[in-house]
Amino acid sequence: AGGAHRLVLSAGHTVPLVYATLAVFDEAMRARLAREGDPAFAFPDGGRWALTWEHLLDLRRNGGLPGHAEMAGRTLLLKWNTGPSGHGMPPSVGEALALRAAGCEDVKVFAIEGEGGLTPGASHETRNSAWGLGLSNLVFLLDWNDFGIDDNPVSSVVHGDPASWFAPYGWRITGTTEGSSFPEVTRAVLEAARGENPGRVPSLAWFKTRKGRGYGTYDNKSHGTPHPLNSEKFWTTRKAFMARYGVAY
């Protein structure tokens, strides 16, 4: 839809989280349809474009869901093919500029990235160009957890914090040190997207998080490290989930 906000998952390797969210949404729709029988909860075209839990079983397999974000098939909501760090930052500027040129400046472009994605040179050009073009419809959402895949924290090689990374380029800044608090995240996102912006400049919302939270393996060690099936950590993470949501494995 022309008025729908755009999502660029610049941190494209995190796309399994999008898949999981869409699968949960599909389950919720199925449950409402079964309980109430209201066709409003049925997906059009027989669910041709829906992403279900069954699709998760083929993640990163031939013909299954790709491991990086792709604007295709069941993930057309993602407005760029992304994967490498920072890859989606320049096109997010292009998307915001195109929307403004089309008279749709009220449509926001949300780009999600981690601080590691700010290290490529193109990210600096992106931040400067977004301000220079006055892209008030561009909102960056930054996951600030101080780790990528390396043993050394990002802060050991990159100086500063989100404010010092974006304020010199003229951006509006908001954020929270409680990046795992839903109310705090919501507040920061709404402030970035809907807050007063008299200078009509791009906005940043940052979230301080802990990489690996709730997984039992933290920081860079959590990256691409699935727990062995039926191991102690495998069941520890599931027990916490079962206790909170009342489900059983």
Predicted feature descriptions by range:
Residues 74-249:
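Glycine-rich ThDP/TPP pyrophosphate-binding loop and its adjacent helix/strand module
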